[in-house]
């Protein structure tokens, strides 16, 4: 059944089960959709439920040289500080390669605490690599190696203002990131990750202006409530107004020649323009945890890094030797769908949002079957995506030249 919404003076028709949408007269849209519905539903079903692990997040150490108040990794684990030996890392990477994993992302705590091991691994194994770092331990030669390997690099920065950023991430962090931006000057696979919280949500538009011309992609992730500290720092109701202003600033910068995209929003927009092409796997249900990727830490394997510290979701590292049993272990996360959540099952945006994050919801309430604490935020972003479509700004967010058109409104 098509839902009708009015956005920016235009009537949108949306099929929530497939994310098909159109602007036009209901009778013509319904006829067009009926002719293609089965194929679109089949495609969405495959995208949502296919298990195909191609990415592994590896936390090679539990240690971090920072103590961010919203960290999703429990403090006792970071204090324990277990790290992988190179031999263990080598063993893990060998098994991943044998089972079809193509992309390895070194993740936090802080991966550069063991930079010698991960850089050696990058020389010894032929994966597509990524790293997420706070950049405080990054040296120029490290940046050169990462660029030589074509690695995607995500650097944390929470504000364009030094005082706020260092309040959240510790003294000296802002200056370290500024040095890193110089090291990576012009590198296309660099992005900045902002954790949006009650101390910095008002800085979102300024953050876009600050980063425009420095990076082409930034992520603006609302803080996860996986930890008590994260829940304490959630931004207040209405923070999405600043987020939407930031989206508009990104579009304005792009039009003026300084292209920058907020990746989280681009993924929502992609959920309408090309639903099964989405890269980020948080806003679909089941999410990508244990389905498209999993996380390997020094103490075990989890469907996603957000579950680290939750013993009931952990598999021993030895489970890598029995791949099919390991994948089966994470079925409990793959079974979690929006259709099981009372507030979500009839929502028109259920396959744009996915009710994230199951780890966050479980940590807070003991069940994964509740709506997202950011429900209203995702609804407003979905409507903003429709607004961007209605006003013809899609190409200022997504690179349409990289996509193949299958259906067009003009076909009616």
UniProtKB/Swiss-Prot annotation:
Pfam families: Radical_SAM
Keyword Iron: yes
Molecular function via GO: 4 iron, 4 sulfur cluster binding; metal ion binding; oxidoreductase activity
Required co-factors: [4Fe-4S] cluster
UniProt-listed SMART domains: Elp3
Keywords: 4Fe-4S, Iron, Iron-sulfur, Metal-binding, S-adenosyl-L-methionine
Ranges of residues in domain Radical SAM core: 50-264
Domain of life: Archaea
Residues noted as binding [4Fe-4S] cluster in the record, renumbered to the chain: 64, 68, 71
InterPro entries membership: 4Fe4S-binding_SPASM_dom (IPR023885), Aldolase_TIM (IPR013785), Elp3/MiaA/NifB-like_rSAM (IPR006638), rSAM (IPR007197), rSAM_cobopep (IPR026423), SPASM_CteB-like (IPR047602), Sulphatase_maturase_rSAM (IPR023867)
Family: Belongs to the radical SAM superfamily. Anaerobic sulfatase-maturating enzyme family.
This protein's name: Uncharacterized protein AF_2204
Organism, scientific name: Archaeoglobus fulgidus (strain ATCC 49558 / DSM 4304 / JCM 9628 / NBRC 100126 / VC-16)
High-level lineage: Archaea, Methanobacteriati, Methanobacteriota, Archaeoglobi, Archaeoglobales
């Amino acid at each position: 059944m098509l839902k009708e919404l009015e956005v920016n003076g235009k009537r949108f028709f949306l099929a929530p089960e497939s994310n098909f949408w159109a602007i036009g007269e209901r009778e013509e849209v319904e006829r067009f959709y009926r002719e293609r519905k089965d194929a679109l539903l089949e495609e969405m079903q495959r995208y949502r439920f296919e298990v195909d692990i191609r990415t592994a997040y590896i936390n090679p150490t539990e240690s971090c040289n920072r103590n961010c108040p919203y960290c999703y990794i429990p403090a006792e684990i970071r204090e324990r500080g277990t790290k992988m030996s190179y031999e263990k890392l080598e063993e893990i990477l060998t098994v991943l390669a044998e089972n079809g994993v193509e992309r390895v992302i070194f993740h936090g705590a802080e991966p550069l605490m063991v930079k010698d091991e991960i850089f050696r691994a990058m020389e010894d194994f032929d994966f597509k690599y990524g790293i997420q770092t706070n950049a405080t331990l990054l040296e120029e030669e490290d940046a050169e190696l990462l660029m030589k390997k074509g690695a995607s690099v995500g650097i944390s920065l929470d504000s364009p203002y030094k005082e706020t950023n260092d309040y959240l991430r510790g003294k000296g962090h802002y200056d370290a990131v500024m040095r890193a931006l110089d090291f990576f000057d012009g590198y296309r696979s660099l992005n900045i990750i902002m954790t949006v919280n009650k101390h910095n949500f008002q800085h979102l538009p300024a953050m876009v202006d600050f980063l425009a011309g420095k990076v082409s992609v930034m992520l603006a992730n609302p803080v996860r409530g996986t930890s008590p500290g994260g829940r304490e720092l959630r931004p207040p109701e209405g923070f999405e107004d600043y987020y939407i202003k930031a989206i508009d600033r990104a579009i304005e910068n792009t039009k003026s020649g300084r292209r920058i995209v907020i990746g989280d929003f681009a993924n929502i927009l992609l959920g309408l323009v090309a639903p099964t092409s989405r890269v980020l796997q948080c806003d679909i249900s089941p999410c990508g945890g244990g389905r498209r990727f999993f996380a390997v830490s020094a103490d075990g394997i989890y469907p996603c890094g957000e579950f680290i510290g939750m013993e009931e979701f952990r598999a021993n590292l030895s489970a890598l030797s029995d791949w099919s049993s390991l994948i089966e272990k994470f079925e409990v996360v793959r079974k979690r769908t929006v259709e099981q959540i009372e507030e979500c099952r009839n929502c028109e945006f259920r396959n744009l949002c996915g009710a994230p994050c199951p780890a966050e919801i479980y940590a807070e309430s003991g069940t994964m079957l509740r709506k997202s604490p950011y429900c209203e935020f995702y609804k407003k972003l979905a409507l903003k995506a429709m607004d961007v479509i209605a006003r013809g700004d899609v190409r200022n967010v997504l690179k349409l030249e990289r996509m193949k058109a299958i259906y067009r409104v003009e076909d009616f």
